[in-house]
Amino acid sequence: MSINQQAYNAIKAIVGDRFISDDPAVMEGYRSGPAGYENGTGYERVMTVLPHAVCLPKDTEEISKVVKICARYDVPYVPYSTGFYGPRTHCHVENELIIDLKRTNQFEYDEKHFFFDVGSGVTLAACQQEAMNKGAYSVIGGGGAQCSAICNLIGDGWSPLSHRIGLPHRRILGTELVLPEGDVVKMGSLAVMDDPFWGEGPGPDLRGMLRGFTGLRGCLGIVSKMAIKTLPFQPEKLVPTGVAPNTALALPPRVRWFNFLMPNKPAQVEAMYQIGHAEIAAALTKVPKFWRAIAKAEDKEEFWKLWLVENEESLRDFFIVRVMLVGYTSQEDFDYQEKVLNDIMTELGGKPTRTKPSDESWIKNADSAGMWLMCGSYVSVDYIIESLTQATQHGDTYAELKKKYTPPLMPDFGDPGWFQGFEMGHQGYSEFLIYWDHREDVDGVDQFYVDTSKMNIKHRYYTSLLGPHQPLFLTGPMYGPNYHTWLLKVKEEFDPNWISHPPVPLAHDDFVNRAPWMQEMKDWETPEKLPMRQW
C-alpha cells in the first residue's frame, strides 16, 4: 500500500474496517475493462491504473470526512458508483483512492410531488420501477438501468423518452455536493430548508458546476445525494415477459410503439418536426438498421450473418421513424394521438410496418448493457444537442470521416448513426457510435476520436463532448471562445491541489502527449507543460 498510513487509518475510523481495503485482489475488481463502454482503447492502456485502496462511505457526512482527510494528507481520489463509463471513471494516477459510492443507497419517493430523493449508489432500475409502481416514470439513458441515477443526471442521461420528458439538467432538484476539499454545498431548496423539492430559478445557477450537456467526471467534487423530478405515467402495469436474455415488457393498451417507413430523409426529419409541433407522443427516434440486426440476432455470430448481407445502398434507402404513444389520461387521449400521428404520416408518405407489442430497450433499458458489444468494444464517439436541422446533418459527416478508419472500426456501410427530437422538437439530437475488436491494433480508434473534434471545428458543429472528453487545448480556443480558460480557472479555485480525479479535465491532453501514435494528430497549440499538478 502506498497511500499514507495515517490517512488510511483515519478513513478506516470513519467507514469501519469492513468498508476499506488495500487488498490487491480487491483492487483488481476495479480494473478498467476488459469490455464495455470505451474499454479496449489506447486511452485505457495509457491512462488507467489500479487503485491503491478503496473505501465505501455511506452518506454525505462520511464522504465529506473522507474527502477532508484526502485533502489533509494529499491523497488523490476518484468518485465511483457503477463504473459504466469505462476508463474515464477509473484511477489515472498512482497511489490513488477510489471512493466507491455503492453504500449511499438512501431512497425516498415523494408520491404527491413526483420526485425521488436518492444517494449515488441507487440505480436507475430501482428508480424507474418505484416510479412506475406509483403511476410515474422517468428516463433511463442509453447506458442502461444498471447505472447510477445521479450519474445520469450529472452526465448525459437521455433517450427517445426525452422527446417529452425534459433533459436531465432540468430535472435536478435539491442536491448535496461535496467539494474537492470536503465542504458540502447544498443546492436548490436544500440551501434554506430540509425539503429538496425545488432545483433553482431561471438563469445561471450552481447546477452548472455539475454538468453541461455532458459532465466533468468527478473533477469538481462528489454529488452525494439528489432529488430527481419524475412525471405522471398511465396507470396500467407493464408486465415483464420472456426468459433472460430474451426479455421484454408487455405493453398495455394505452402504451404502444409504432414504426413508419418514410420515403426519404427529409420526410423522416419533417415527421419529427410535426410530431413535436402537435405535442403528441412519449418517445420518438430514428431507427438505424444496425439496431434491427442486433434485435433479431441471438448471438454475435448470427448478428454478423445478418449484418454482412447489407451494403451502402440498402442502408441509404432505410428511413424508419419509431414513435411511442402513451394515453396518459385516458384511452381517448391515446386514440387522439394515434389519429394525429396517422394524419402526419399519411401526408408525408410514411408507411406503417410491423413492430412488437412490447418494449426491450427504452422504458427499462434491460438490454443496453450488452446490446452494443457485437465487436467487444464500443463508444459514443460524439453527440450533439442542437436544432433538428443540424443534428440530422451531423451523422453524414461522421460516416464519411469514419471510412478512413475502417478497419479497425467495424464496417457499417456508411450508416450515419442515430438522431431524434428532444423536448417536442425544440432540440435535435445526433449520436454516432463506433465499434471495434479490442484484440486488434486499435491506434486508429484513438486517432478517429480526436479527428472528429477537428471535423466538428471545421464544419462548425456544436459538440456535447467537450471538457474532459477531448483535448481541452484543441476544443477550448474554438468554442466559447476559450471556454478552457474558464474551466481551468474554476478547477483551480475549487481544487487547487488537483486531488479530485486528476488529471481531469486535462486527461485527454495528457493522453495525446504520452501516446506515440497520437503525435501525428497533434497540430494545435498547447502549452509545453500542461497547467496541472504532476503526481
Describe the residue ranges of each PLM region.
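General beta-strand structural signal in soluble alpha/beta enzymes
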Residues: F19-P24, L56-P57, Y77-S81, I99-L101, ...
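Long, structured ligand/cofactor-binding scaffold of large enzymes
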Residues: Y37-Y137, S148-P160
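C-terminal cap/substrate-recognition region of VAO/PCMH-type FAD-linked oxidoreductases
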Residues: P202-D205, R211, A227, L238-T247, ...
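Conserved oxyanion/phosphate-binding beta-strand-loop segments in alpha/beta enzyme cores
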Residues: I14-G42
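Short beta-strand-to-loop capping motifs
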Residues: K58, N259-A267, R322-Q331, Y383-Q390, ...
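Conserved glycine-rich FAD pyrophosphate-binding loop
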Residues: E44-H52, K65-K68, D74-P76, Y80-E96, ...
